[in-house]
Amino acid sequence: FLHPGSHKNQGIEKGLNLIVEGLNQIDVSNGQMICIETMSGKGSELGCDLNQIAYIISNASIPLYVCIDTCHLFSSGIRLDSFDDYLDEFDKLIGIEKIKVIHCNDSMMPFGANKDRHEKFGKGLIGESDLFNVIFNEKLEGRPIILETPNDLDGYKIEIEKIRRKFHELREN
């Protein structure tokens, strides 16, 4: 997973071109998969909107993919209660097949705050319902989901059980 980085006040275009230049130096001949992670947009951070990610993917000479991070999306101003709209736009600009993995976590920070502060599943400002919108979205079926919540092993166990219960509930209905 690649956090694209920041342009450090050099401008978005220059920053994106430097990222592409760096990526073009990577040898992926052994089958490595590089996933650009969606970002929250703090400071001069890049990769917080689809146009920036599309630019990087379309200008790099190596195959690139995407990791969607729920906290980062929420913090960058993407509503997860209308996640299908985001996926439709993603598909138009980049292609939904480029999404390879989801980092699932709640957010300590309010919507659109452009700050990256992960919270335990369902304990933050995104909430369980919107996180389930992402986890159980049919357009993303079969992709791995990684819990990136601030937790210990027992906490992860509780979160996994919560998700598992919802999965079984949805299958029964």
PLM region descriptions:
Residues E37, E148, E159:
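Acidic-residue sensor for enzyme active/binding pockets
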Residues I26-I34, A60-I62, L93-E97, N133-R143, ...:
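A structural motif corresponding to the C-terminal end of an alpha-helix
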Residues P4-K8, T38-K42, T70-F74, D106-M108, ...:
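Active-site-proximal loop/turn and secondary-structure-junction residues that shape catalytic pockets
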Residues F1-Y65:
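Active-site acidic/histidine proton-transfer and metal-coordination neighborhood
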Residues I34, D69, I102, I145:
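Conserved, mostly hydrophobic/aromatic
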Residues E13, L46-L50, F74-G142, P150-N151:
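Gly/Pro-rich active-site loop or hairpin
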Residues L153-R171:
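C-terminal helical cap(s) of enzyme catalytic domains, especially alpha/beta-barrels
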